[in-house]
Amino acid sequence: MNFLYSTVNTLRDRYTPVSHKSTFRQTGQITPEEFVAAGDYLVYKFPTWSWGDADSPERRVSHLPPGKQFLVTRNVPCHRRLNDDFAGDAGHEEALVNDGDDFKGNAGDDEDGWLRTGGLASSQPLKVKEVRTVDDSGNVGDREVVEDDEIPDMEDEDDDEAIIRDSGADSKNSAHRTYTLYIMYSPYYRTPRLYLSGYLANGQPLPPTDMTEDIVGDYKDKTVTLEDFPFFANNIKMASVHPCKHASVMKTLLDRADAALRLRREKLRAGNASSSQAPSGMEGLVDEIGKLDVKGAQEAADKDEWEEVQEAEIDDQEVAIRVDQYLVVFLKFMASVTPGIEHDFTMGV
């Protein structure tokens, strides 16, 4: 069934007439030319990304130039699985982020928000643990509380010869993985499409079915398929996030970013904020993307709802996110699908 599904998707993209009419603001879809512009922007701003070419001229698509058939980034770290351990950790490290929060401790005006899980370890108080000691005869002592000051610093110990290392077992059982991420253009859906190829800690290819351990359950069960990457001559199975909802989610994210920008500018005009508080350039883009409610946008797309935003006319100078910045927002969306994969690693400025 998966093979048939993959074949149908490939044929759709191969034979669908390509549209060159821009409907970026209206639909969240982009043209091949806009995909190239967004790819050039991504590669320029984030050099861990690069353009790739098909293995042979026969595998190239005519609507994209040679050498710019897809985007790729390699060695993206992934340190933990999306299993019960991941969920439990997230449950202990969650916070409500209000719309308008600046992520520096200042709350926004909106009471609604989205739940941010994980990544808050530094904000949690350290808990004192009870430990037991064992003497030279093997007798177990009573429980006692150990304070931080009493814990020896391993850096102060020089007894390296006493450490038993098993590098083979470590690499086999390690939770650490790396991923190569590919972004191609889908003419049928007129959106980017993400492919993932994983590797174990020892460098061995990750079995395709194991890649689903790093994908959020809702997507893993519904919209993720294992398919061959169409630009490679050898059949290499990868996990791919199906783009059927990409356009509607992206449209909602773009609309919300524009609405937030308009609100900020209205406050500036009203004198409620100084011009120095309005970030610009790459800093401003990262700030806008960091506040996007991906979860809410996904829910709206699942219900086939279009975000209702004020119908004010907006020119290119007033939009929060330009079309050439499309892939930066797209990767924010994909990071919510694969939260264990450190997408931020690929986007260091």
From Swiss-Prot:
Domain of life: Eukaryota
Any GO molecular function: Atg8-family ligase activity
Localization per Swiss-Prot or TrEMBL: Cytoplasm
Keyword line: Autophagy, Cytoplasm, Protein transport, Transport, Ubl conjugation pathway
Region (Flexible region): 95-173
Region Handle region: start-end pairs: 248-325
One GO biological process term: nucleophagy
Transmembrane segments: none
GO cellular component: cytosol; phagophore assembly site
Keyword Cell cycle among record annotations: no
Phenotype seen when the gene is deleted: Significantly decreases the radial growth of colonies under nutrient-rich conditions. Causes only mild infection in point-inoculated spikelets of flowering wheat heads and impairs the spreading to nearby spikelets. Strongly reduces the production of deoxynivalenol (DON), an important virulence determinant.
InterPro entries listed in its UniProt record: Atg3/Atg10
Keyword Plastid in annotation: no
Catalytic residues as annotated in Swiss-Prot or TrEMBL: C244
Motif ATG8 interaction motif (AIM) per UniProt: ranges: 306-309
Function (record text): E2 conjugating enzyme required for the cytoplasm to vacuole transport (Cvt) and autophagy. Required for selective autophagic degradation of the nucleus (nucleophagy) as well as for mitophagy which contributes to regulate mitochondrial quantity and quality by eliminating the mitochondria to a basal level to fulfill cellular energy requirements and preventing excess ROS production. Responsible for the E2-like covalent binding of phosphatidylethanolamine to the C-terminal Gly of ATG8.
Family: Belongs to the ATG3 family.
Subunit structure: Monomer. Interacts with ATG8 through an intermediate thioester bond between Cys-244 and the C-terminal Gly of ATG8. Interacts with the C-terminal region of the E1-like ATG7 enzyme. Also interacts with the ATG12-ATG5 conjugate.
Record note on domains: The N-terminal region is involved in phosphatidylethanolamine-binding and is required for ATG8-PE conjugation. The flexible region (FR) is required for ATG7-binding.
PANTHER family listed in its UniProt record: UBIQUITIN-LIKE-CONJUGATING ENZYME ATG3
Protein name as annotated: Autophagy-related protein 3
Organism lineage: Eukaryota, Fungi, Dikarya, Ascomycota, Pezizomycotina
